[in-house]
Amino acid sequence: FVTVLGSITDILVTEFGNNFINLSFLRLFRAARLIKLLRQGYTIRILLWTFVQSFKALPYVCLLIAMLFFIYAIIGMQVFGNIGIEEEDDESAITQHNNFRTFFQALMLLFRSATGEAWHEIMLSCLSGKPCDENSGIKEDECGNEFAYFYFVSFIFLCSFLMLNLFVAVI
């Protein structure tokens, strides 16, 4: 009864515009109607309880995803971290902000790849035949690696198919 009375008062104050006092707290009664509805519906309560219980396993799935990103970022830094960045080359997906030089940049590149944004272009930019960075101290001419095929395809497979399905299955 109090919920309905508070909601009606809020609607009347809003409609007639007598805002001489700030009565915005009355909008809480609208939310109270939803809580009252949830108490009455048995099936809605069961559904919400199941949803809340699924949050217990969610941190473990998030930890597994974080471990996958961590491992792939470290491997990417070791294998592809010395690829040179060419300012004038528009075809290369390895840029100043999109590379494996630091751990944070590697994580950002992997997150970008996990979302599906041009991961194949990044993979092709990490293949052999790419020049090394002058500041890396490496005397070799090429810093790319054919390992990029396995690296990116396995990462996309694990992220897109296994982890995403595991995340959705928990929820």
UniProtKB/Swiss-Prot annotation:
Native organism: Gallus gallus
Protein family: Belongs to the calcium channel alpha-1 subunit (TC 1.A.1.11) family. CACNA1A subfamily.
Assembly: Voltage-dependent calcium channels are multisubunit complexes, consisting of alpha-1, alpha-2, beta and delta subunits in a 1:1:1:1 ratio. The channel activity is directed by the pore-forming and voltage-sensitive alpha-1 subunit. In many cases, this subunit is sufficient to generate voltage-sensitive calcium channel activity. The auxiliary subunits beta and alpha-2/delta linked by a disulfide bridge regulate the channel activity.
Annotated site residue numbers, Calcium ion selectivity and permeability: 117
Protein's job: The isoform alpha-1A gives rise to P and/or Q-type calcium currents. P/Q-type calcium channels belong to the 'high-voltage activated' (HVA) group.
Membrane topology according to the record: Multi-pass membrane protein
IV repeat residue intervals: 1-171
Catalysed transformations (reactions): Ca(2+)(in) = Ca(2+)(out)
InterPro entries: Ion_trans_dom, VDCC_alpha-1_subunit, VDCCAlpha1, Volt_channel_dom_sf
Gene: CACNA1A
One GO cellular component, as annotated: voltage-gated calcium channel complex
MF term (GO), any: high voltage-gated calcium channel activity
Extracellular face of the membrane: 12-18, 77-143
BP terms from Gene Ontology: calcium ion transmembrane transport
Keywords: Calcium, Calcium channel, Calcium transport, Cell membrane, Disulfide bond, Ion channel, Ion transport, Membrane, Repeat, Transmembrane, Transmembrane helix, Transport, Voltage-gated channel
Gene3D superfamilies cross-referenced by the UniProt entry: 1.10.287.70, Voltage-gated potassium channels. Chain C (1.20.120.350)
Name the UniProt record assigns to this protein: Voltage-dependent P/Q-type calcium channel subunit alpha-1A
